[in-house]
C-alpha cells in the first residue's frame, strides 16, 4: 500500500456520520481510509462498501479498551506506517435525565466511552499521526458540551462527557503545539441518526416543539459529513485548539 496516499483513520466508521465520512473520503483520489468498528462482522453496510472500494479497510476497535486501541494502531502501522488525519468519531448518547436522577452507571459509561475512549485512541495513534504529513486530529464533539452556548435540555452524562472531551482536546492541542499538529473538536450539527432521534423523542415529552424542529432542520448524515470535511480540508496551523461548528464557525467552550 503506497504511503504517498493520504491516510485517514475514522474511529467509529461503521454507521451514521462515521460511515458517511468513510464514503465521501473513499471516493477521493489518492485516499486510503481505515474505518473502525467494535464488531466488524456486524458492520454490514461498511462491509459492503469496502467490497466495492479497495481503499477502505475495516479495523476492529473497542475504544473503551486501550489494549484494543493499541492493537488497531499496530495493524495500521504494519499496513501503511502513518496516519495523516485521525478522526475520533466513536461515542454513545443515552443520557436524557436530570443530574438528580442520573444513576452512576450512566455517568460512568458516558465518561468511559466519550472521554477515555478518545484518549485511548489518541495515545495509541499519536506515533502514527506524528509520522503523517497533515498531523490532524479531529474529535467529534457536540454543542451540548459547550458551557458558553448552553443547550437547554437535560443531557447530564452526555453533556458532561462532551465538555470533558473538549477540555481534553484543548489540552492535547497545547501539548502538541510545537510539533506541527492541528487538533480540533467539531460539532456535526443536529443530524438525523438513530441516537439523535432517540434523544428528540425523550425530550419531546417536556418540549413537544422539538419534534417539529428536528424534522425540519436535522441534517442527513451525508450532509453533515460533507460540511465537516470542508472544515477539516481547510484547517490551518492557527486553528489548533479550536472548537468548530460543522459550518466552519467557532463554538465557545
Curated annotation (Swiss-Prot):
A GO-annotated cellular component: cytosol
EC number: 1.-.-.-
Binding site for NADP(+): 17, 36, 62, 89, 158, 162, 191, 193
Gene3D superfamilies, A to Z: NAD(P)-binding Rossmann-like Domain (3.40.50.720)
Biological process annotations from GO: cellular detoxification of aldehyde
Cited InterPro entries: Fungal_SecMetab_SDRs, NAD(P)-bd_dom_sf, SDR_fam
Record's keyword terms, sorted: Cytoplasm, NADP, Nucleus, Oxidoreductase
CDD domains noted in UniProt: carb_red_sniffer_like_SDR_c
Location of the active site: 158, 162
NADP in keyword set: yes
A Pfam family the protein falls into: adh_short
Subcellular location: Cytoplasm; Nucleus
GO molecular function terms noted in the UniProt entry: oxidoreductase activity
PANTHER family named among the record's database cross-references: NADB-LER2, SHORT-CHAIN DEHYDROGENASE/REDUCTASE
Family: Belongs to the short-chain dehydrogenases/reductases (SDR) family.
The protein's name in its UniProt record: Uncharacterized oxidoreductase C663.06c
Organism (species): Schizosaccharomyces pombe (strain 972 / ATCC 24843) (Fission yeast)
Amino acid at each position: 500500500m503506497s504511503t504517498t496516499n493520504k491516510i485517514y483513520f475514522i474511529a467509529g466508521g461503521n454507521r451514521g456520520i462515521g460511515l458517511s465520512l468513510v464514503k465521501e473520503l473513499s471516493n477521493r483520489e489518492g485516499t486510503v481510509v481505515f474505518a473502525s468498528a467494535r464488531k466488524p462482522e456486524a458492520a454490514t453496510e461498511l462491509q459492503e462498501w469496502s467490497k466495492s472500494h479497495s481503499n477502505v479497510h475495516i479495523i476492529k476497535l473497542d475504544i473503551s479498551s486501550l489494549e484494543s486501541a493499541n492493537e488497531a494502531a499496530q495493524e495500521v502501522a504494519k499496513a501503511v506506517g502513518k496516519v495523516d488525519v485521525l478522526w475520533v468519531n466513536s461515542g454513545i448518547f443515552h443520557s436524557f435525565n436530570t443530574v438528580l436522577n442520573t444513576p452512576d452507571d450512566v455517568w460512568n459509561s458516558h465518561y468511559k466511552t466519550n472521554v477515555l475512549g478518545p484518549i485511548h485512541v489518541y495515545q495509541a495513534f499519536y506515533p502514527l499521526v506524528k509520522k503523517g504529513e497533515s498531523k490532524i486530529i479531529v474529535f467529534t464533539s457536540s454543542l451540548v458540551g459547550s458551557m458558553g452556548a448552553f443547550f437547554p435540555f437535560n443531557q447530564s452524562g452526555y453533556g458532561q462527557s462532551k465538555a470533558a472531551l473538549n477540555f481534553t482536546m484543548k489540552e492535547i492541542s497545547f501539548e502538541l503545539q510545537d510539533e506541527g499538529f492541528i487538533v480540533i473538536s467539531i460539532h456535526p450539527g443536529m443530524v438525523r441518526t438513530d441516537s439523535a432521534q432517540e434523544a428528540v423523542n425523550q425530550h419531546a415529552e417536556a418540549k413537544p416543539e422539538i419534534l417539529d424542529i428536528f424534522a425540519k432542520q436535522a441534517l442527513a448524515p451525508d450532509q453533515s459529513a460533507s460540511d465537516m470535511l470542508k472544515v477539516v480540508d481547510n484547517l490551518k496551523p492557527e486553528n489548533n485548539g479550536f472548537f468548530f461548528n460543522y459550518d466552519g464557525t467557532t463554538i465557545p467552550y
